[in-house]
Design a protein with these regions (language model features):
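Active-site phosphate-binding strand-loop segment of PLP-dependent enzymes
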Residues: 150, 154-206
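Conserved PLP-binding catalytic core of the aspartate aminotransferase-like
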Residues: 297-306, 311-346, 356, 360-361, ...
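Short loop-beta-helix segment that forms the pyridoxal 5′-phosphate
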Residues: 78-84, 93-116
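Conserved PLP-anchoring active-site segment centered on the Schiff-base-forming lysine
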Residues: 117-136
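Active-site C-terminal subdomain of aminotransferase-like
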Residues: 200-203, 210, 215-321, 334
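PLP-dependent enzyme catalytic core of the Aspartate aminotransferase-like
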Residues: 3, 58, 62-66, 70, ...
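N-terminal "arm"/small-domain region of PLP-dependent enzymes with the aminotransferase-like
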Residues: 7-73, 202
Length: 395
């Protein structure tokens, strides 16, 4: 039997390779940080979600070791059997305190949080209205739910309003959006979304994965940026980006919503609890962020420094409020060649092109971190400038 599907898979894989879409893993032989080791050489890392530079933070590493010593290596159980330790509850409270919400539920990943949030809450008589550029995990979560589905053009409030008008016959309506869209780096217009939600009696859900730790005066995310703390019904997020970069996701928001997810959210009910090391480090991470805004302030300064340098060099940079800087190249092959040449120059980035982004919108996505020094940012800008001139992207 396998011989038949083997031939089919080999053909599909060959087509993926021929189209230049085959994904290869680039092996790192160092901790995740601003400068990493790849293929036996050191390179500057500008493609990680390590926004606050915490992935190799000594304080978090020590907290993880301490939690493992005191609470063990793993839980070997789901939460509602014997997989809930006191530190899991402590981390859930820390998340709620950070975002100004009523309660929190932890997941193995934010993919699980987004995948498990809709089906327990909404049914055939309800409507889910989702931004067209939402993350794949939201798309998959919506597919698992029987609610009527609407999709509006990215951050297009006129289109969103039309969807809300069409959904008025449904029992409940919920608007779902990424806080920051990962390919362009643009932030959702949450103030306008909330205004429309109030006008048309809809709930609001925001995925804070790329906005938490980044947006807002103190980095508390998009709800802080738009002065909507405690007003958004559902927030999802991850410990795998700004918050240390390990694993783990969460949903935080209205108390009754979180309670229902504990009863019926399948990824929560049928997945092991987060391991103590991750939980202990997460608690310490939120403690650090409560003590000081230094890392967030450094990130904001680094993003501004990098964007100004790149625009001065003549590059086309997408407008952004986040730590994601999309350097537009438009041509797919050029984006691949540019990324390869940058690695030769000691800068580790990735070129993105169709179907990850629309045709003719190829780019290199640069992700700035609080862990980058000014010298490292300048070296990155210099490398971009050198390669940009070689490939006739800039003069």
């Amino acid at each position: 039997m396998y011989g038949k599907i083997k031939e089919h898979l080999q053909q599909e894989l060959a087509e993926i390779k021929a189209a230049g879409l085959y994904k290869s893993e680039r092996v790192i032989t160092s901790p995740q940080r601003a400068e990493i080791e790849v293929a036996g050489r050191k390179v500057l890392n500008f493609c990680a979600n390590n926004y606050l530079g915490l992935s190799d933070n000594p304080r978090l590493i020590e907290a993880a070791k301490k939690a493992m010593d005191n609470r063990g290596y793993g839980m070997s159980s789901v939460r509602f059997l014997c997989g809930c330790q006191d530190i899991h509850k402590e981390l859930e409270k820390a998340v709620a305190d950070y975002f100004g919400t009523e309660d929190t539920i932890l997941y193995a990943a934010c993919f699980d949080a987004n995948g498990g949030v809709f089906e327990p809450l909404f049914g055939e008589q309800d409507a889910i209205i989702s931004d067209a550029l939402n993350h794949a995990s939201i798309i998959d979560g919506v597919r698992l739910c029987k609610a009527v589905r609407y999709r509006y053009a990215n951050a297009d409030m006129a289109d969103l309003e039309e969807c809300l008008k069409k959904a008025q016959a449904q029992r409940f309506r919920i608007i779902c959006t990424d806080g920051v869209f990962s390919m362009d780096g643009n932030a959702a217009p949450l103030d306008e979304i909330c205004a429309l939600a109030e006008k048309y009696d809809a709930l609001v859900m925001v995925d804070e994965c790329h906005s938490a730790g980044v947006l807002g005066k103190t980095g508390r995310g998009i709800t802080e940026l738009y002065d909507r703390r405690g007003q958004v019904d559902i927030l999802t997020g991850t410990l795998g980006k700004a918050f240390g970069g390990a694993v783990g996701g969460f949903t935080t928001g209205r108390r009754e919503i979180i309670d229902m997810l504990r009863q019926r959210s399948r990824p929560y009910l049928f997945s092991n609890s987060l391991p103590p090391a991750v939980v202990g480090a997460g608690i310490e991470m939120f403690r650090m962020l409560a003590e000081s805004n230094e890392l967030h302030d450094r990130l904001v300064a680094n993003v501004e420094h990098f964007r100004e340098g790149m625009m001065a060099a003549g590059f086309d940079i997408k407008p952004t409020q986040s730590a994601i800087c999309a350097v537009m190249l438009y041509d797919a092959k050029l984006s691949q060649d540019f990324a390869a040449r940058l690695q030769d120059e000691g800068v580790f980035v990735t070129g993105f092109y169709y179907p990850v982004v629309p045709k003719g919108q190829a780019r290199i996505r640069v992700q700035v971190s609080a862990g980058h020094t000014t010298d490292q940012l300048d070296r990155c800008i210099a490398a971009f400038t050198k390669v940009g001139k070689e490939l006739n992207v800039i003069k």
